[in-house]
Amino acid sequence: MMITRWLFSTNHKDIGTLYMIFGAWAGMVGTALSLLIRAELSQPGALLGDDQIYNVVVTAHAFVMIFFMVMPIMIGGFGNWLIPLMIGAPDMAFPRMNNMSFWLLPPSLLLLLASSGVEAGAGTGWTVYPPLAGNLAHAGASVDLTIFSLHLAGVSSILGAINFITTVINMKPPTMTQYQTPLFIWSVLVTAVLLLLSLPVLAAGITMLLTDRNLNTTFFDPAGGGDPILYQHLFWFFGHPEVYILILPGFGMISHIVAYYSGKKEPFGYMGMVWAMMAIGLLGFIVWAHHMFTVGMDVDTRAYFTSATMIIAIPTGVKVFSWLATLHGGVTKWDTPLLWALGFIFLFTVGGLTGIVLANSSLDIILHDTYYVVAHFHYVLSMGAVFAIMGGLVHWFPLMTGYTLHNTWTKIHFGVMFTGVNLTFFPQHFLGLAGMPRRYSDYPDAYTLWNTVSSIGSLISLIAVIMFMFILWEAFSAKREVLIVEMTTTNVEWLHGCPPPHHTYEEPAFVQAPR
């Protein structure tokens, strides 16, 4: 029974739960790695060993957090759980492929962890640039194992993307148009399209790197007529859409949370929200070289990428102000998910503003590869994506389990987490402006103060993670059952009770055609 249910599952709710649990474990691994980084940097001098070990930890931290924490939880966990419920589908379009998408991830994580354990590990950074990632600077199997790990995670995401696109377009009730689906559906649809278009390019790039390393090809080796800059273009053509893949489902979740706790039946400016997400998805593909301002591109090329990058701020602003407009004039229910959503809106906006700064190619020459960049993307990831995940978890936990989290504990947890991440990442702006470079395990004494502050912040975040584990245990232990859910007519995922039965919508939902 256990084996057929959890290993061979074709049920979207069970697979979503598997994704959630996997993401939680990977999140703890990624958090542990981040604490190793902050411990090393808490004061000048060496702690763990040389820079190779340090960079292996940094690389593993990035890969684990991106591919095994944020994406599995947001897309695999929330996507699987909510999308069929929100559109009235009995399950995903391809339930067995859905199962394979999940089970490709544990071996992928295993390969990634193995890459750290053999030879000297892959100390390349998550970008895996040659020639550092070539077979001279990284002899041995480490980088090859990392590449295979990425291949598996990539195949998993591509299959998942196909599944989500098919489900969202094809499994709605016949009278329901795409413009009647909730915003979370749209966010995952756009995300899936981005995955489908960007991952094959990454696969091509890392496959060429694999053959450069093992089969004597010279795609990225000038000695044989290749060009390492080609790899950068291929990687970032995937890498930039990837960061939007990480945040877009969060946008969808935040829209639902803000509308729900404002007591509104719908978010402000539904169509604007939809088009903003589609615009972000499109623009995300034509700005990739802003990661490469320092490699010597023509001035007109740099001018274009600066301008195009800044244009993304417009649809993003549409979303931020629509969230604020949704809050306006509502009957605000100050529950924990709303706190996460408000934290998201504020901190994501701060991260977006530093992004505008970095979009200026001339400024980026100075700030590239400094802690200013680290601060920027951790504001949008560690306080954007993670806050969205936390808000979504606290909001939908009763739906997924049938139990309620402790109201006071979750609020305290939010406060601790908010303090921790801000104390960790805000000082890094100062370090970057003062010229401290990324990816070094040691630094001049002048940078000591803010690094120490940052590392103390990371310990506060650790306390928050441990608190959250306790909060989950407490909920399953106390077993407070859900009494009533408000506004189910505009939040249809709650219609079947908490938790919903194993199979929902076994006969098609009736949707009144618009007059």
Swiss-Prot record:
Claim: Cell wall biogenesis/degradation is one of the keywords in the record: no
Subunit structure and binding partners: Component of the cytochrome c oxidase (complex IV, CIV), a multisubunit enzyme composed of 14 subunits. The complex is composed of a catalytic core of 3 subunits MT-CO1, MT-CO2 and MT-CO3, encoded in the mitochondrial DNA, and 11 supernumerary subunits COX4I, COX5A, COX5B, COX6A, COX6B, COX6C, COX7A, COX7B, COX7C, COX8 and NDUFA4, which are encoded in the nuclear genome.
InterPro entries: Cyt_c_oxase-like_su1_dom, Cyt_c_oxase-like_su1_sf, Cyt_C_Oxase_1, Cyt_c_Oxase_su1_BS, Cyt_c_oxase_su1_dom
Residue ranges that the UniProt entry lists as topological domain Mitochondrial intermembrane: 41-50, 118-140, 213-227, 287-298, 358-370, 434-446
Gene3D superfamilies membership: Cytochrome c oxidase-like, subunit I domain
Major place of residence: mitochondrion
Keyword Translocase: yes
GO MF annotation: an example: metal ion binding
Transmembrane feature ranges: 12-40, 51-86, 95-117, 141-170, 183-212, 228-261, 270-286, 299-327, 336-357, 371-400, 407-433, 447-478
Cofactor(s) required for function per UniProt: heme; Cu cation
Species whose genome carries this gene: Latimeria chalumnae
UniProt KW keywords: Calcium, Copper, Electron transport, Heme, Iron, Magnesium, Membrane, Metal-binding, Mitochondrion, Mitochondrion inner membrane, Respiratory chain, Sodium, Translocase, Transmembrane, Transmembrane helix, Transport
GO cellular component: mitochondrial inner membrane; respiratory chain complex IV
Side Mitochondrial matrix, residues: 1-11, 87-94, 171-182, 262-269, 328-335, 401-406, 479-515
One Gene Ontology term from the biological process aspect of the record: response to methylmercury
Signal sequence, start to end: none
Chain residues that bind Mg(2+): H368, D369
Subcellular location, record wording: Mitochondrion inner membrane
Amino-acid positions noted as binding Cu cation in the UniProt annotation, renumbered to this chain: H240, H290, H291
EC assignment: 7.1.1.9
Protein name according to UniProt: Cytochrome c oxidase subunit 1
Cofactor note: Binds 2 heme A groups non-covalently per subunit. Binds a copper B center.
Reaction(s) catalysed by this chain's protein: 4 Fe(II)-[cytochrome c] + O2 + 8 H(+)(in) = 4 Fe(III)-[cytochrome c] + 2 H2O + 4 H(+)(out)
Function: Component of the cytochrome c oxidase, the last enzyme in the mitochondrial electron transport chain which drives oxidative phosphorylation. The respiratory chain contains 3 multisubunit complexes succinate dehydrogenase (complex II, CII), ubiquinol-cytochrome c oxidoreductase (cytochrome b-c1 complex, complex III, CIII) and cytochrome c oxidase (complex IV, CIV), that cooperate to transfer electrons derived from NADH and succinate to molecular oxygen, creating an electrochemical gradient over the inner membrane that drives transmembrane transport and the ATP synthase.
